[in-house]
Structure formats: structure tokens, C-alpha cells
Amino acid sequence: MAEETIFSKIIRREIPSDIVYQDDLVTAFRDISPQAPTHILIIPNILIPTVNDVSAEHEQALGRMITVAAKIAEQEGIAEDGYRLIMNTNRHGGQEVYHIHMHLLGGRPLGPMLAHKGL
């Protein structure tokens, strides 16, 4: 089994966090280092280290992450103008916490997906 992460403690409310949504499958909270006016992390309540570790048993939680993202975008007033959902996987993908999570970013034009530094 994977090691517990800081996100596990947020789910259990053992450490302070600005939780904007929580149910039996997912938790969503504001990022402590926001990269946009709205920057919320949406995580499954079960520890799944990376996207590579996802299996069929996780489909309900992963689907809920998407529907919760849309609901939060509406509540935050960014749904109409648009927003970005990002999941990073492993070191080259930029993953820093090994508990899969989806970034919901919006509130301003976000620019290109990747910095153009060549292939």
C-alpha cells in the first residue's frame, strides 16, 4: 500500500484547509499556492498514488471528480468564461504529491498549455 500523504490528513480534517466540497468519494479544497484566481484541488478520498495506479474500481470516484469540478466552476462563477482541469502524473509530468489530484484553474485567461521550450 502507498504511503499516506498530506492530502489524507486534509480529507480527515486533521490539518487546516479551505475545503469547498466533500462527500464520501471526493474532497475539494483551495490550493495554498494558487496559480490562478480560482485554483482548487479535487482529490479522491481513497489514496491512489498516480494515474498509472487507477483501476476499474476507481471509476466512480474519478467520475465524481469531474462532476464536482463542473459544480465548483459554476459556484465560483468561472463556468461560462471557461476553466482548465489538469492532472499531473509522476516526475516528468510535474506531480509533487503522490495522491492523484485534479487542478481546477480559472478566473482569468490561462494562456498556452505548455511553455514552448522545444522538443
From Swiss-Prot:
Domain of life where this protein originates: Bacteria
Query: What is this protein's gene name?
Result: hinT
Q: What's an example GO cellular component term for this entry?
A: cytosol
Question: What does this protein do, in the record's words?
Answer: Hydrolyzes purine nucleotide phosphoramidates, including adenosine 5'monophosphoramidate (AMP-NH2), adenosine 5'monophosphomorpholidate (AMP-morpholidate), guanosine 5'monophosphomorpholidate (GMP-morpholidate) and tryptamine 5'guanosine monophosphate (TpGd). Hydrolyzes lysyl-AMP (AMP-N-epsilon-(N-alpha-acetyl lysine methyl ester)) generated by lysine--tRNA ligase, and lysyl-GMP (GMP-N-epsilon-(N-alpha-acetyl lysine methyl ester)). Is essential for the activity of the enzyme D-alanine dehydrogenase (DadA) and is required for E.coli to grow on D-alanine as a sole carbon source.
Task: Please name the CDD domains in this protein's record.
Answer: PKCI_related (cd01276)
Q: What processes does the entry annotate via GO biological process terms?
A: D-alanine catabolic process
The protein's GO terms of the molecular function aspect are: adenosine 5'-monophosphoramidase activity; nucleotide binding; protein homodimerization activity
Q: Which NCBIfam families match?
A: PRK10687.1 (NF007965)
- Tell me the null mutant phenotype: Cells lacking this gene fail to grow on both D and L isomers of alanine due to a defect in DadA dehydrogenase activity, preventing D-alanine utilization. The mutant cells do not have appreciable nucleoside phosphoramidase activity. The loss of hinT results in failure to grow in media containing 0.75 M KCl, 0.9 M NaCl, 0.5 M NaOAc, or 10 mM MnCl(2).
- What's the EC number here? 3.9.1.-
Q: Which UniProt keywords apply?
A: Hydrolase, Nucleotide-binding
Q: What is this protein called?
A: Purine nucleoside phosphoramidase
Taxonomy of origin reads: Bacteria, Pseudomonadati, Pseudomonadota, Gammaproteobacteria, Enterobacterales
Coiled-coil positions: none
State the organism named in the record: Escherichia coli (strain K12)
Q: Which residues cross the membrane?
A: none
Protein residues bound to GMP? 30-32, 88, 96-97, 101-103
For this protein, the record's InterPro entries field holds: Histidine_triad_CS, Histidine_triad_HIT, HIT-like, HIT-like_sf
Q: Where is this motif: Histidine triad motif?
A: 99-105
Outcome of swapping residue 101 to A/G: Abolishes enzyme activity
What subunit structure does UniProt give? Homodimer.
Family to which the UniProt record says this protein belongs: Belongs to the HINT family.
- List, for all copies, the residue spans of the domain called HIT: 6-115
Q: What class of enzyme is it?
A: hydrolase
Catalytic residues as annotated in Swiss-Prot or TrEMBL: 101
